From Swiss-Prot:
Organism: Malassezia globosa (strain ATCC MYA-4612 / CBS 7966) (Dandruff-associated fungus)
Gene responsible for this protein: LIP1
Activity as a function of temperature: Optimum temperature is 25 degrees Celsius.
UniProt KW keywords: Cell wall, Disulfide bond, Glycoprotein, Hydrolase, Lipid degradation, Lipid metabolism, Metal-binding, Secreted, Signal, Virulence
Protein name (record): Secreted mono- and diacylglycerol lipase LIP1
Regulation: RHC 80267, a well-known inhibitor of diacylglycerol lipases from mammals, also acts as an inhibitor for LIP1/SMG1.
Phenotype for W229H: Decreases considerably specific activity
Length: 304
């Protein structure tokens, strides 16, 4: 029922957008480069997966240990606003982990369904190239938390004498995380250290995707598991485009993975049929489960 509600909301949004013709139809290119061996640090991916899994858990007491990381602060509760955990990690620095869709929250569901494109928020539009467009729902979800995230990150960077900031997200939280990672790179002293994004949906148009490549391409880590369908939405036909490079775990929930270079690589995830369930979206990412509300609480890094 919850999944059906999401699908109906999504298709209703597409119909409304199509009728009003308020989205961009520009379509970016597709990479034809062959995949290469996974160059990413899989231990860091495993840790990042645990840190974002914990955002789905109700245990939010400061001092909680997940992997090498200590939970410092939590904002949002997953209903009116997505939950965001702030950690300190010897591996990742100050780590910002953002929860994905809470299917028990209509507000959270609606963020996924608002497919139309809009300009970047007035707070950061000056940093983006002309013509940049972002999905309304994902940007709205991030803007609800933007000021609190910046305040907390600045506070804990100072308290922990830490220069590194890593942003992590899953699903809706991955889209929010990409926008947050760009915002930190563009507007915060010291910029971004890394970002790890799991099951990332498309966030913006080709202008945005290419600007991500330009600004944080060497810090950007997108991980897709198996036949996960979430990274295939919103559709490219609506003017959306992924930034370059993703690691594809295939078969799903295994440790077999390759990097697919460039934007929208033709040899990757679209070569296999999608499965419209959450078995791979909420799966095992290099020995750590991201199971959302049905996952392990507290999160267990490297337990699989």
């Amino acid at each position: 029922m919850l999944f059906s509600r999401f699908v109906l909301l999504a298709f209703g949004s597409v119909a409304a957008v199509s009728a009003s013709s308020i989205y961009a139809r520009g379509r970016g290119g597709s990479s034809t480069d062959q995949p290469v061996a996974n160059p990413y640090n899989t231990k860091e991916i495993s840790l990042a997966a645990g840190l974002v899994q914990q955002t789905y858990c109700d245990s939010t007491e400061n001092g909680l240990k997940i992997g090498d990381s200590e939970l410092l602060y939590t904002m949002g509760e997953g209903y009116a606003r997505q939950r965001v955990n702030i950690y300190h990690s010897p591996s990742l620095g100050i780590a910002v982990a953002i929860e994905g869709t809470n299917l028990f929250s209509l507000n959270s569901d609606l963020h996924d369904a608002k497919f139309w494109q809009e300009d970047p928020n007035e707070r950061y539009i000056q940093y983006y190239p002309k013509g940049t467009k972002l999905m309304h729902g994902f940007q709205q979800a991030y803007n609800d938390l933007m000021d609190d995230i910046f305040t907390a990150v600045k506070k804990y960077k100072k308290e922990k004498n830490e220069k590194r900031v890593t942003v992590i997200g899953h699903s809706l939280g991955a889209a929010m995380g990409l926008l947050c990672a760009m915002d930190i790179e563009l507007r915060m002293d010291g910029g971004l250290y890394k970002t790890y994004l799991f099951g990332l949906p498309r966030l913006g148009n080709p202008t945005f995707a290419s600007f991500v490549d330009q600004k944080i391409g060497d810090k950007f880590h997108s991980i897709i598991n198996g036949r996960d369908w979430v990274p295939t939405v919103p559709p490219r036909a609506l003017g959306y485009q992924h930034p370059s490079d993703y690691v594809w775990i295939y078969p799903g929930n295994s440790t077999s993975a390759k990097l697919y270079p460039g934007q929208e690589n033709v040899h990757g995830i679209l070569t296999v049929a999608r499965e419209f369930n959450f078995d791979d979206h909420q799966g095992i990412y290099f020995h750590t489960q991201i199971g959302a509300v049905m996952g392990e609480c507290p999160a267990q890094v490297g337990a699989h």
